[in-house]
């Protein structure tokens, strides 16, 4: 997802950065600011930045430049109670990851994930490998890693 489709010039643009859009539900509507260079940050730093930009959105204190330049977006309906859904890609981004509500199934926790992606830019097999790697990284020790 370091790519984007240039509709006007029919080109594929390779990005040298990975900015993640985070969908934030506010009383003013949905806002999708970006966490810049997310691939080079520790999980603890991402968590702090997520809280900061979410608060800025809710208080209308965020600079509008924070809404541009995303590589992909992460959206969650878990807090509202949604499980599986099909998130819609925010052009010119090429993918969006939807996170549902954690549910308990047979004494195990399950986190529903839905990945939508632009097949013109992202190969379906690569998307499946991404989902498998994400699943592996969210394995048993994930909650422990977050608490460090």
Report residues per predicted region.
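C-terminal catalytic/motor cores of large multi-domain enzyme assemblies
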Residues: 3-148
């Amino acid at each position: 997802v370091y790519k984007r489709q240039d509709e006007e010039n029919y080109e594929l643009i390779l990005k040298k950065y990975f900015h993640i859009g985070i969908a934030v539900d506010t009383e003013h509507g949905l806002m999708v600011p970006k966490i810049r260079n997310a691939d080079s940050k520790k999980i603890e730093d991402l968590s702090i930045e997520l809280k900061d930009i979410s608060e800025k959105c809710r208080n209308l204190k965020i600079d509008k430049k924070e809404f541009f330049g995303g590589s992909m977006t992460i959206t969650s309906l878990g807090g509202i109670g949604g499980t599986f859904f099909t998130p819609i890609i925010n052009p010119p981004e090429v993918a969006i990851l939807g996170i549902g509500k954690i549910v308990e199934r047979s004494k195990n926790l399950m986190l529903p994930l839905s990945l939508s992606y632009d097949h013109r830019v992202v190969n379906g097999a690569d998307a499946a490998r991404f989902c498998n790697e994400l699943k592996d990284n969210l394995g048993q020790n994930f909650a422990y890693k977050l608490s460090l």
